[in-house]
């Protein structure tokens, strides 16, 4: 099992409507891309010094499934229309989950 974690920092000009649209589109991802085994995302709670504004956690059975998700047309369209213009930076990590 592979876990993908992406932490996003917004641009200074991002609006609440853009964040809501981003989150709503993310919520639909597992319905369209059936390779996703677990999918969670949410805004930082600002409980301490934050390094990111939003996080996504997704699990996949294999590395190949992760790459298929990454290149899936729905995911690519999401990045182009709902993400790239509001994200100042993103940190990603993928790792194997212990059996």
Please annotate each region the language model reported.
Residues 1-41:
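N-terminal first-folded block
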Residues 3-9, 41-70:
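Short, well-ordered beta-strand segments in beta-rich or mixed alpha/beta enzyme
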Residues 4, 26, 43, 54, ...:
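Aromatic-enriched hydrophobic runs in primary sequence
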Residues 11-13, 63, 98:
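Generic structural motif
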Residues 18-21, 48, 71-74:
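Generic, well-ordered alpha-helical segments
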Residues 31-36, 59-93:
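An amphipathic, aromatic/His-enriched active-site/gating alpha helix that lines ligand/cofactor pockets
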Residues 40-50, 80-99:
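Glycine-rich beta-strand-turn "strand-cap" elements at beta-sheet edges
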């Amino acid at each position: 099992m592979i876990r993908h974690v992406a932490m996003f920092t917004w641009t200074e000009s991002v609006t609440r409507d853009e964040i809501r649209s981003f989150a709503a589109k993310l919520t639909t991802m597992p319905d369209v891309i059936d390779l996703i085994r677990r999918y969670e995302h949410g805004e930082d709670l600002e409980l301490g010094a934050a390094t990111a504004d939003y996080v996504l956690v997704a699990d996949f059975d294999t590395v190949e499934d992760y790459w298929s998700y990454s290149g899936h047309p729905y995911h690519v369209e999401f990045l182009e229309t709902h993400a790239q213009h509001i994200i100042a930076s993103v940190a990603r990590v993928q790792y194997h989950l212990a059996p």
